[in-house]
Amino acid sequence: MATEAAFTTQVPEKDQVTYFCLGIGKFLSLSLKFSNFIRMYWSWCDSLLHFPVNELNKNPVEGFSAGLIDDNDLYRWEVLIIGPPDTLYEGGVFKAHLTFPKDYPLRPPKMKFITEIWHPNVDKNGDVCISILHEPGEDKYGYEKPEERWLPIHTVETIMISVISMLADPNGDSPANVDAAKEWREDRNGEFKRKVARCVRKSQETAFE
């Protein structure tokens, strides 16, 4: 039977922390070969993505829809986000991709808008920059609390709720698109509004291409 000391020699220290966080690593090391544990771990990660995609298809959530880009790849999703009512983004149908890391849910997915969107917290390449999608732990710049960043309890639904909230209430203090943030602060009902309206119209034209 393997001992805890044997586990320590087989697994790098950084990985010990990861598996301990799962709450099962050291227990499984007593009865499983490390390679078998890794296979079980990846299977567990897959199941965490397989269930929500089925659940969202059966019970859609207002404001967005989600599905796999490729039925054979659980780690790449496509989402359609409806611009929230009573905001400048109302009426928009914005397409985005979620790309999950292999060690999800320990680390967050990346989100990228495919539809053009003008927003302070979305950079010009479409990458979304909000706290919930930032790597877990302390913010070295001190802008975010650990509990505001990624936690393994978050789901696709909580991510999308945060993104919809971001559309309704941009964070101009921590922008990914500095030009959009400047316009949002200084000319919200002028140039910023015109650029958003153009993106909304374009999103409607290309939503189902």
Predicted regions and their residues:
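UBC/E2-like fold recognition across ubiquitin and ubiquitin-like conjugation systems
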Residues: 1-93, 97-209
